[in-house]
């Protein structure tokens, strides 16, 4: 169950799962090539892709950009601990952080801190500015810890989809 609901992925057949795997590898693949790879003719393949989009399995298509070419080579993770004494502090923080383009990811986590943020900036000076002028001023922020990535060993957005 997902939030009290049935897990929709359990109803996917082998062909749907293969379609999703192929689209994760190459979102720009032509329908004709995709249909060959999954063993369907083009029309039913396209119908399945459109159904998977309608049902929310496919949320969109995007280009993977090289951050080192685009002045965003410093990858930083930030632990955020909130002052839990304020009412609605989590909701206020969530609303505020969603407006920040600099934040690529924000996750509410269990453990010794409340949120884990991911950001990319040009350099340490830019990060110091982001921290001092933006992150520390977010609603309810009590403490932060910064982790600067020295080397990206593995990075992937792909989900493991078992084809059974």
Swiss-Prot record:
Keyword Transcription regulation: yes
Pfam families associated with the record: AsnC_trans_reg (PF01037), HTH_24 (PF13412)
GO CC terms, sorted: cytosol
MF (Gene Ontology): sequence-specific DNA binding
Organism superkingdom: Bacteria
DNA-binding region: 31-50
Alphabetical UniProt keywords: Activator, DNA-binding, Transcription, Transcription regulation
Record InterPro entries: ArsR-like_HTH, AsnC-type_HTH_dom, Dimeric_a/b-barrel, Tscrpt_reg_AsnC-like, Tscrpt_reg_AsnC/Lrp_C, Tscrpt_reg_HTH_AsnC-type_CS, WH-like_DNA-bd_sf, WH_DNA-bd_sf
PROSITE patterns on file: HTH_ASNC_1 (PS00519), HTH_ASNC_2 (PS50956)
Gene Ontology biological process terms from the UniProt entry: alanine catabolic process; regulation of DNA-templated transcription; response to L-leucine
Residues annotated as domain HTH asnC-type: 12-73
RNA-binding found in the keyword field: no
Reported function: Mediates a global response to leucine. Exogenous leucine affects the expression of a number of different operons; lrp mediates this effect for at least some of these operons. For example it is regulator of the branched-chain amino acid transport genes.
Assembly and interaction partners: Homodimer.
Name of the molecule in the record: Leucine-responsive regulatory protein
Lineage of source species: Bacteria, Pseudomonadati, Pseudomonadota, Gammaproteobacteria, Enterobacterales
